Design a protein with these regions (language model features):
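A cross-family kinase active-site recognition segment
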Residues: 115-174, 195, 298
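Catalytic-loop of the protein kinase fold
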Residues: 194-199, 204
Length: 298
């Protein structure tokens, strides 16, 4: 976020916490990208703050990223995590002192989460695969309506096609992304793999190594689809250790993931710290063709 917006986001998080009776003194920004993540102390709550521009209706954007859809996704995220916590799945849950819902202050959408102190950075690949398998088992036990992964692909295709959303994308690169998404999604759908609720982006940045064991966070992009879609977001050493995974399907999903990330980096509204530099890198990886690398290797 731009600095003035980030300051307002922190203030909104403080206000939301105070409104529900949580004491707030110091604040620490844990992550600042398209959504701000801030630790509030001494109540030790993690507030995830979505800016007003992401919540307002934007006719040029695809439905996945429209304001109405984004608010629905935040509500779905809270419900999915609430249900997972109830069946003891490995998740960093919502703060139990706060009603499990989306709060709105000064136009910002805010959700309140339990803070878990990290106890190390690297999770061994075998442990990562095991805890992801455990998460998937927990997800199969809950019944929460989520979008299909193809809804997300279709939204990315719309953004790629829109010169208003991706104005700086060269026409050859626009065609590369459009063709990649079209061809791979058609191949994947024709495989008719078994589907279930998924995390949506279980990459290493969304796994906390805590004293309670590894915990998944950030279910904002939870979708319905084959487990191989989730596996396309994790390092290769992890996906190879996941029991009974179709590695060919994982590879195809990796191409989809690279194309989606590239499209996001070229969006006019993207505020990811890596910016256009990573957008170029992902396009170059796609040009090289299969086998596509995991996104963390680009």
């Amino acid at each position: 976020m731009q600095a003035p917006v980030a300051r307002r986001a922190v203030a909104a998080a403080r206000s939301a916490a105070s409104t529900v009776g949580l004491p707030v003194g110091a604040t620490v920004v844990l992550n600042d990208s398209n959504r701000l993540v801030v630790r509030l102390m001494p109540c030790d709550v993690v507030a995830r703050v979505t800016p007003p521009e992401a919540l307002a209706p934007v006719t040029a954007r695809a439905s996945w990223l429209s304001g109405e859809a984004y608010q629905a996704r935040l509500a779905t995220e809270a419900e999915v995590v609430k249900r997972l916590a109830e069946n003891d799945s490995p998740v960093a849950g919502l703060d139990p002192r706060v009603e499990p819902r989306v709060f709105v202050h000064d136009g910002f959408a805010i959700t309140m989460w339990t803070y878990f102190a990290p106890v190390g950075r690297m999770l061994p690949s075998a442990d990562y695969a095991q805890v992801l398998e455990c998460l998937h088992a927990g997800l199969r036990q809950i019944d929460v309506p989520t979008p299909h992964f193809m809804d997300r692909v279709a939204a990315t295709q719309q953004d790629v096609a829109s010169r208003d959303v991706t104005p700086d994308l060269a026409e050859t690169d626009r065609a590369l992304l459009a063709n990649t998404l079209r061809d791979l999604s058609e191949t994947i759908v024709n495989r008719r793999a078994a589907e279930q609720i998924l995390h949506g982006e279980p990459h290493p940045g969304n796994v906390l190594k805590t004293k309670n064991g590894p915990l998944f966070m950030d279910f904002e992009d939870s979708v319905h689809g084959p487990v191989e879609f989730d596996l396309a977001w994790v390092p290769k050493e992890v996906s190879e250790r996941y029991p009974d995974a179709d590695q060919a399907l994982v590879g195809e999903f990796r191409g989809v993931v690279l194309a989606m990330i590239a499209a996001h980096r070229w969006s006019r509204d993207d505020q990811h710290p890596s910016g256009r530099q990573s957008g170029v890198a992902f396009l170059n990886a796609l040009r090289e063709g299969p086998p596509w690398p995991p996104h963390d290797a680009v």
